[in-house]
From Swiss-Prot:
CDD domains: Mrp_NBP35 (cd02037). Heterotetramer of 2 NBP35 and 2 CFD1 chains. PANTHER family: CYTOSOLIC FE-S CLUSTER ASSEMBLY FACTOR NUBP2, NUCLEOTIDE-BINDING PROTEIN NBP35 YEAST -RELATED. This is Cytosolic Fe-S cluster assembly factor CFD1. HAMAP family: Mrp_NBP35 (MF_02040), NUBP2 (MF_03039). The lineage of its organism: Eukaryota, Fungi, Dikarya, Ascomycota, Saccharomycotina. One of its GO terms (biological process) is iron-sulfur cluster assembly. Keywords: 4Fe-4S, ATP-binding, Cytoplasm, Iron, Iron-sulfur, Metal-binding, Nucleotide-binding. It is found in: Cytoplasm. [4Fe-4S] cluster binds at residues 214, 217. GO terms for molecular function: 4 iron, 4 sulfur cluster binding; ATP binding; ATP hydrolysis activity; ATP-dependent FeS chaperone activity; iron-sulfur cluster binding; metal ion binding. Belongs to the Mrp/NBP35 ATP-binding proteins family. NUBP2/CFD1 subfamily. Component of the cytosolic iron-sulfur (Fe/S) protein assembly (CIA) machinery. Required for maturation of extramitochondrial Fe-S proteins. The NBP35-CFD1 heterotetramer forms a Fe-S scaffold complex, mediating the de novo assembly of an Fe-S cluster and its transfer to target apoproteins. Required for biogenesis and export of both ribosomal subunits, which may reflect a role in assembly of the Fe/S clusters in RLI1, a protein which performs rRNA processing and ribosome export.
Amino acid sequence: MSSELLQEVPKSIEHVKHIILILSGKGGVGKSSVTTQVALTLVNKGFNVGVLDIDLTGPSLPRMFGVENKQVHQSTQGWVPVSVYNNNNNQGTDSKRGNLSLMSLGFLLGDRGNSVVWRGPKKTAMIKQFLKDVVWGSTETPLDYLLIDTPPGTSDEHIAIAEELRWANPIDGAIIVTTPQQVATADVRKEINFCKKVNFQILGIVENMSGFICPHCSECTNIFSSGGGKALSEQLNLTYLGNVPIDPQFVELVELQNEQENKKLIELYDDCELKPILNGIVDKILDKNLPSRI
């Protein structure tokens, strides 16, 4: 990497090895759920993971991770992301796990019901601040993966993050989340075109809500159509990372950790039917052996 380019890299991400965006062509496909589970899976594999939520008008990740009531703190280097899971405080059976931290506008709103009614320039400024002023990792403890959860479609937030990340190359690329229905896969094509225009590598497609896991017998039934994501991957010569069914148990685990402070989602997730499925998806990404940024 040239010295000129190094000068442009935000100091906040100079200790980040890998950057992955999670995108979706339309809303309601469960993108934030996939982001949450990819983060949990990487942490379970021993990686230190940070999650940046740039869905400014619908920041749901603080609740997904059970840290809605936490606050962002300021340090001499910048904003410190909220710690979701710190393995330094959980030795023993958890010693192989990594650490997990989160930054989201949800921590700054004060009330969960507060709405964000911002025009493009203010959104762009907020995303720049998130990327440049949040301290991700350190020389002693670098961040292995920074996952960036984006809003659906291609909006001001996407343009802003693409502009800011142009100095962060090489970033790993993007995971695109869709559902099996044609109305969702049609919008995925727009997201793919966006990635090509901004030179984001597409790591693969995840077909979410592909089937329904019965809470009584654990049998998976295709209540919707299935195979749309896989067919699109084959048609466009992209990696098909896998399909994730709807599992009511995962929703229950998210709510359980919010109701009981001593429960952490990463520990509850060990018994979730979706865990081996996400393991397979993450392994396909790891098998690409993408180069580290540092």
